[in-house]
């Protein structure tokens, strides 16, 4: 049987996806390499909704260690923020960075990042887009972080089985990684309650031997920012897990 006309297109798209995954992993290593100094502002996005421009190579030459000794002394903690597209990952990062929300849903084509200083360490949060072509690469980043935040749209009953499947893959990848599951959009009509989400995500029986937390949140584009109670609780829990 002769090959279908779509065959070459599928192969080309597959190759492009593989290249994208490799680039994402290289950027991750360059951006979040432990002990390496960066020169981007807090909350700057690389490939996300805020900007489509990558920093030029001559903009991130290594800093002189004597110029910023205090920054060099701070340890780094890495948090990976994942979830299906539309679950609220980008809005969550914008709130933590103190940026105003963006109206409507703007999908992340690549990743966004935020660096937040604390008294004893700096927290780097990396969001990878939740579209189907990017989910394949999620597992490559799990072993590089200290905590996983998994965002779930509490109103998206149709795709909840997909979210459960992706979450299970990540949990299997690193059995010891602390996981914070954020049940987002709890303020909307039709949102599943916490008991329903525990059942649908398989949390009641599967993960008794590891640190898995399920928190309710209402991280909406029109929300009140970092002062939103759900966001504050998530941040406090992250600090406890990272300390």
Curated annotation (Swiss-Prot):
User: Its Gene Ontology molecular function terms?
Assistant: GTP binding; GTPase activity
Q: Which Pfam families match?
A: Arf (PF00025)
Q: Does the keyword GTP-binding apply?
A: yes
Ligand binding (GTP): 83-90, 127-131, 184-187
Q: Does the keyword Nucleotide-binding apply?
A: yes
Q: Which Gene3D superfamilies match?
A: P-loop containing nucleotide triphosphate hydrolases
Which SMART domains does this entry report, sorted A to Z? Answer: ARF (SM00177), SAR (SM00178)
UniProt-recorded name of the protein: ADP-ribosylation factor-like protein 10
Species source reads Mus musculus
From the UniProt record, report the name of the gene that encodes this protein: Arl10
